[in-house]
Amino acid sequence: MYALTHGRIYTGHDVLDDHAIVVANGLIERICPLADLPAGIEQRNLGGAIIAPGFIDVQLNGCGGVQFNDTAEAVSVETLEIMQKANEKSGCTSYLPTLITTSDDLMKQGVAVMRDYLSNHPHQALGLHLEGPWLNIVKKGTHNPSFVRKPDAALVDYLCQNADVITKITLAPEMVAPETIRQLTDAGIVVSAGHSNATFAEAKTGFRAGIRFATHLFNAMPYISGREPGLVGAIFDEPDLYCGIIVDGLHVDYANVRNAKRIKGDKLCLVTDATAPAGANIEEFIFAGKTIYYRNGLCVD
């Protein structure tokens, strides 16, 4: 047990001076005034540094020059360790490694790797995010169309049986039966709507079945029109639904970001959806079987 002292503590609600953070067995036990520290406890003086909660990124394909995607070699514990170190340099302490649309075999390898990683690093990655493969092909984005498919019972059962290491699955609600969505949510997996061409009614059916999140708001979704609100309109009409949004000025116009924040409030969260160049000095990489080039802050194929 030890105490972090002489730092300015940002709790998310208050800014605390003359307080300490007591750490026991690798976890924060409590925050207390300096005067209330136990006698004799080891104190680590931070010299006025800021102490704040780390960022949590719920959609991260890769960073630090590596990707948790594409090949059996890349979907590894070592890749996750590199990603964690790169994240920490920018203040991100926890994340969901995101494995995009791929084969059943590589998905199962991703699950096994996630289990192995969590057994040795319990407070870093927060479980696996499977982005696909049950997407709408017309909104596939960079995902490999040869792997986009409908659910089959065997794979659904496997994912549910491993829900302790699978935190989130992104799917297109119009492509997946409500019963399957309900099965996944009943297993404890957060189901997210994304890469979808759903109508307002189709999206609402998915929400009623248990969808609680939406993946990268506005991107790989149909436009809102006067007569058809579509998936985006359904998200805005669902006050308890959370959604991620990429705020780099390229994926989503800032006016749309502002409007989304006004409508969704604290249900809107930032995601990076980052790839290998984040936190690394590289000019190209492989993603979804394609060579991607990093040019002037933008990834292009």
Question: Model-derived features: where do they sit?
Answer:
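N-terminal metal-binding scaffold of metallo-dependent hydrolase/deaminase domains
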Residues: M1-L37
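Active-site glycine- and acidic-residue-rich loops that bind
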Residues: S103-Q109, E174-A177, V190-N197, I246-R258, ...
